[in-house]
């Protein structure tokens, strides 16, 4: 699984001109599911997301998690994160999980985040979405479950 996470002061996702998910302060996560990803990957990523200290404390140091600042998470599926642009001019999506598996693991990731008690909004899997956000910082990170160490 690959995730692009952005610290936001607000974010929303629209489908067909209607807002389907919105948050105030928190994290926008764009999630791509790849072939070979498992529920273990979803669990690792959900745990990492809930505890990642990317919000500033009173001293201005990134020392607080989304839970500690009483923020929210907006999770948006984005299969293009599995795209490979190494050859030619058109991305290859050969490594993207099939839609049924991608949806199952995306839904599992969302369920696991919600189980932490963090308010979580979502987009709609496979929909053509418009994502609006105010990136706070900007603060953006890329997480890849395939490159995690065994100690994290």
From Swiss-Prot:
SUPFAM superfamilies the UniProt entry points to: DTD-like (SSF69500)
Subcellular location: Cytoplasm
Short sequence motif Gly-cisPro motif, important for rejection of L-amino acids: positions: 137-138
Entry-linked Pfam families: Tyr_Deacylase
Primary enzyme class: hydrolase
Catalyzed reaction equations: glycyl-tRNA(Ala) + H2O = tRNA(Ala) + glycine + H(+); a D-aminoacyl-tRNA + H2O = a tRNA + a D-alpha-amino acid + H(+)
Keywords linked to the UniProt accession: Cytoplasm, Hydrolase, RNA-binding, tRNA-binding
Signal peptide stretch: none
Alphabetized InterPro entries for the sequence: Daa-tRNA_deacyls_DTD (IPR003732), DTD-like_sf (IPR023509)
Keyword Cytoplasm: yes
Family matches, as HAMAP family: Deacylase_Dtd (MF_00518)
Protein family membership: Belongs to the DTD family.
Oligomeric and partner information: Homodimer.
Domain notes: A Gly-cisPro motif from one monomer fits into the active site of the other monomer to allow specific chiral rejection of L-amino acids.
Main function: An aminoacyl-tRNA editing enzyme that deacylates mischarged D-aminoacyl-tRNAs. Also deacylates mischarged glycyl-tRNA(Ala), protecting cells against glycine mischarging by AlaRS. Acts via tRNA-based rather than protein-based catalysis; rejects L-amino acids rather than detecting D-amino acids in the active site. By recycling D-aminoacyl-tRNA to D-amino acids and free tRNA molecules, this enzyme counteracts the toxicity associated with the formation of D-aminoacyl-tRNA entities in vivo and helps enforce protein L-homochirality.
Stated name of the protein: D-aminoacyl-tRNA deacylase
Organism: Geobacter sulfurreducens (strain ATCC 51573 / DSM 12127 / PCA)
Primary gene name: dtd
